[in-house]
Amino acid sequence: MPTPNSVVGPYFDELVVGQVFDSAPRMTLTEGAAALHQAILGDRLRLALDVELAEAVTGTPGLPAHPGLVTDVAIGQSTLVTGRVKANLFYRGLVFHSYPKLGDTLSTTTRVVGLRQNAVREGRAPTGLAALRMTTTDQHGRLVLDFHRCAMLPMAPGVVDTGHHDDLTTIGADEVSTDPAGSWDGAAFRARVPGPHFASELAGHRYRSSADVVSSAPELARLSLNIAATHHDWRVGGRRLVYGGHTIGLALAQATRVLPNLATVMGWQSCDHTGPVYEGDTVYSDLHIERVSPLPAGGGVLDLRSLVFAVGAEGGDDRQVLDWRFSALMF
C-alpha cells in the first residue's frame, strides 16, 4: 500500500505561528477563466460582463475581473496550507484594496497567525484550527486583497497534544477602510443602465432568491488552483465537499438577480460556513439589506446579509449552510 504523500499539505501539528507560504503559482486572470467562472456560477454583475459600461464607469480601459473570481483565486492559492482541510469555518475582514482587470496576474502570500487545538473527542481523530492571513497582490505589487480565514486541519497520526491554545475570536475583526472605487462615475452607470438604482429606502428590505443547483464543483476548485483534497477526493471524508467559495459565488449570483444594479463587492465583514454543501444540492438565499450609506457623488454602499440554505438532491429538510455579511456598491 502506498505511503501518504506529504505534498497534500501540512498537518495541524506541523504549523507554527509566523510561518509563511508563498510558493503557489501566480495566476493571470484570462477571458477563458472568467467565462468558465461565469458559466459555473451564473453571476450577472454588469461591470464584469460589459466592457463598454465598465470603461465608462471606471475611466480605465479593459474589463474588470469579477470580484468573485479574484477571491476564488486568492483562496485557491492559499490552499498550499490547507490541502488536508476538514472544514473551513469562517472568513473575516476581506477587503478589496484595488480591483484587477482581466490580464492582471495575482499572487497570494499566506501567513499562519493563530493556532488552537480542538478538544479531543472519543472516536474522532484529533484536529486543530489554523487562523490564516492572506494578502494578494497584482503583477505591479499593488495590494488587491487582505483577509483572514480559519481552517480545521487534522493532526498527524500519533500526535496527542500540540500545546496550541491561541484565542482566535478577535483575529480578522479589525475594520479597514478602503475606497478603490472612489473615482468611478456613478452617473455614467445610471445613464446607461435602467433602474431601479440606489435609494435610501432600500434599507430594511428582505428578499428570497430563486434557487440554483450546485454543479461543476471540482471544475471550479481546479480553475481557482484550490488543491484541498476534500473537494476532489471522496475518500478523504466519505463524501466530497463543495468548496465554500462555490456556495458564496452562488449566493452572490442570487444577490445580483435580486439587485441587478449592484456595481461590485467592496468587502466581506464575515462569512461563516454553518453546514456542508454537496454537489447536486440546490441552494437559495434570503438577502437582507441591513444598512445603506449614501455617497456624496450619488449611489451608495449596501451592507448585506445573505443566509443560504441547501436542499439535498434526495430531498429532506432545508438546512442552513452559510451566513455571509458583505458590502456592495450600488449606483
Stretches found by the model and what they are:
Residues 1-57, 152-238, 327:
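Non-catalytic linker/capping segments at the edges of enzyme domains
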Residues 71, 91, 134, 185, ...:
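Aromatic/pi-system hotspot detector in well-structured domains
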Residues 30, 63, 67, 213, ...:
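Hydrophobic alpha-helical segments and helix-packing faces
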Residues 237, 241, 266-268:
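A beta-strand-loop signature enriched in Asp, Gly, Thr, and Trp
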Residues 25, 92, 130-132, 203-205, ...:
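Structural beta-strand/beta-sheet cores of well-ordered domains, especially the beta-sheet scaffolds
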Residues 12-15, 28-29, 64, 94, ...:
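Hydrophobic beta-strand core residues of beta-sandwich domains
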Residues 1-19, 102-183, 279, 286-331:
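HotDog/MaoC-like acyl-thioester-processing domains
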Residues 55-65, 69-115, 247-290:
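Hydrophobic beta-strand-centered segment that forms part of the acyl-chain substrate-binding groove
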